[in-house]
Amino acid sequence: MYKLRKVDKMNRRNFLVGAAGAALSTTMTDRTLGMGIEFHKVGAFELRKYSLKNMAQAEMLHNYLKDAFIPVAKKLGCGPIGVFEQVNHTEIQVVHVLIPHRSVATAFELNQKLSQSKEHLEKGEAFWKATPANAPYDRYESSLMSPFHGMDHLETPDVKSQRIFELRTYESHNDRAGFKKVDMFNIGEIDLFRKAGLNPVFFGQTIIGSHLPNLTYMLTYPDMAAHDAAWKKFIADPEWKKLS
């Protein structure tokens, strides 16, 4: 028996913090936007969600990402890569990895190239030789996204100080409704976000993944007080009320 899902609404919202030393490191910069924000041209985004059972898995996964995956993926043209831990948990249960690609084609090629990289296999040896009883994660999900025309790049904030990242997913009941929501962002909603202090990191329309059709985006703030103030300002904006 299947249960009907309510759609055309914000279905998921997660608050994340950047994992130490790995949150959107700002190499491969194309342009500086000012105020510590950097601009990175992107052809496609991959978003991975690793589910973990314990801190031992978290440590093994982070060591692999830091020592093997991120350095080699950068050499293959990906980046800047972001690693985020979900907050409001006593233990790390979910780790999100954001991987910007030059194109959809390079996204499909990444895993094969990693499997052929001697450096990747050697530096990630403990990860790859882990037994089923000592697996580095339970499972992971992956989605591939196309950047919006209204923001076809990644914006990385200054991550020297701690920040909150908000990952939001909006599901639609059919593709036409999904494209209409993307258009709403492109023609004005992104600009209204910026005006209110909702600082965007990326916007992506999911082309491969679960719960389609959907779009996903990430915002960032110095802290939760700034988050609350920005959303309050956005919701009260007369221009948003006209657009919606």
Map each language-model feature to its residues.
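Intrinsically disordered, low-complexity polar regions and short flexible loop motifs
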Residues: V72, I235, W240-K242
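Glycine-rich beta-strand-turn "strand-cap" elements at beta-sheet edges
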Residues: L16-V42, G77-E91, L121-Q162, G197-H211, ...
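N-terminal secretory signal peptides and thylakoid transit peptides that target proteins
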Residues: Y2-A23
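Mature N-terminal segment immediately following signal peptide/propeptide cleavage
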Residues: V42-L61, K66-L76
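Short, well-ordered beta-strand segments in beta-rich or mixed alpha/beta enzyme
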Residues: A44-L52, V83-S117, F165-S172, Q205, ...
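Surface-exposed interaction/gating patches
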Residues: P147-A225
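Extracytoplasmic/secreted proteins, especially bacterial periplasmic and envelope-associated proteins
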Residues: M60, Y64, A68, T106-E109, ...
